[in-house]
Regions:
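Short gly/pro/ser/thr-enriched loop/turn and capping motifs at secondary-structure boundaries
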Residues: 82-84, 101-104, 125, 152-153, ...
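Long, charged alpha-helical interface segments
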Residues: 175, 182-258
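SAM-dependent methyltransferases
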Residues: 27-28, 32-52, 236-258
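N-terminal beta-strand-loop-alpha-helix module at the start
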Residues: 32-109
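Short, acidic/small-residue loops that bind anionic groups at enzyme active sites
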Residues: 167-180
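Short Gly/Thr/Asp-enriched flexible loops that form oxyanion-binding sites at enzyme active sites
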Residues: 153-164
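Short phosphate-binding loop-to-helix
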Residues: 116-137
Length: 258
């Protein structure tokens, strides 16, 4: 307070009395937003950084996975997913989990300690959740999960539930299914003859359109508890649009639809 009891002197820390401070705070906020966007996407206008998470359970072959190491920004193996990763020719950047289901512990010997993140068996997250979180924390905005087929039904349902989260994976590939998240539009070439099914995420998915399917989705609304099962891709190019809500699309691998 200046002598004589006048108004407080303008200060860089007193934004109400210092327009320059307000402008500085605004610029700082925008800089932080840009930095966060750059971390997740790789830069303005760039595609999201791609992460690959290998987990325990039956996984796809290399052709069904379709991922190339040079296109993946970060690969993480969760527990027994390490064996699947190495089987498919991927050496993960990090191995995470409690390692209780990794049958061959000697596989860990090829990784330095700073690339193995160990967690206790008694924890609030599954190894899959930990792997997904690690990828997110390291800037991956487009995550594919490989593995998780067969085995316990509760584990399968828990992985499927990840697609309901705020930052879901984009894809999950097992030995028998290629599962994709469709938020607005999906397009693929080369699936002609494949069996595909569609399930809504959340309360409903509506305003749908499609091209290249035997039974078009045009005008349909899938509410929670309903699904479109055993559709078939009839053209080289298939496209699906969702107006409101989200869809899970399940492509059957290696078997004829029932």
């Amino acid at each position: 307070m200046p002598a004589g009891g006048g108004a407080p002197e303008a200060s860089p820390f007193n934004g109400r009395n210092n327009p320059k401070a307000l402008e500085g705070f605004r610029r700082l906020h925008e800089t932080r937003k840009t930095a966060i966007l750059s971390l997740v996407t790789g830069g303005e206008g760039a595609s999201p950084r791609r992460g690959l998470l290998f987990i325990g359970g039956a996984g796809p072959d290399r052709e069904s996975l379709g991922e190339r190491r040079g296109e993946v920004w970060l690969a993480v193996a969760a527990d027994a997913g390490l064996a699947l990763a190495l089987q498919l020719g991927f050496e993960p950047d990090l191995v995470v989990g409690d390692m209780d289901s990794l049958s061959d512990r000697s596989l860990l010997d090829r990784f330095p300690p700073d690339r193995v993140l160990r967690f206790p068996q008694d924890k609030d997250e599954t190894d899959t959740e930990i792997g997904l979180r690690v990828l997110r924390e390291r800037g991956c905005g487009d995550v594919t999960i490989a593995g998780g087929g067969g085995g316990r039904v509760d584990h399968l349902l828990a992985i499927a539930a990840l697609f309901e989260r705020e930052d879901p994976p984009r894809r999950w590939v097992t030995d028998g299914a290629d599962i994709r998240l469709i938020e607005e539009e999906f397009e693929v070439i080369g699936w002609e003859g494949s069996t595909v099914s569609f399930l809504p995420l959340g309360s409903q998915a509506s305003g749908m359109r499609s091209e290249g399917l035997q039974w078009p989705l045009d005008g349909l609304c899938f509410r929670r508890g309903y699904a479109g099962i055993s559709n078939r891709v009839m053209a080289r190019r298939m496209r699906v649009w969702v107006g409101t809500g989200k869809l899970l699309m399940v492509r059957t691998l290696g078997e004829v639809s029932r």
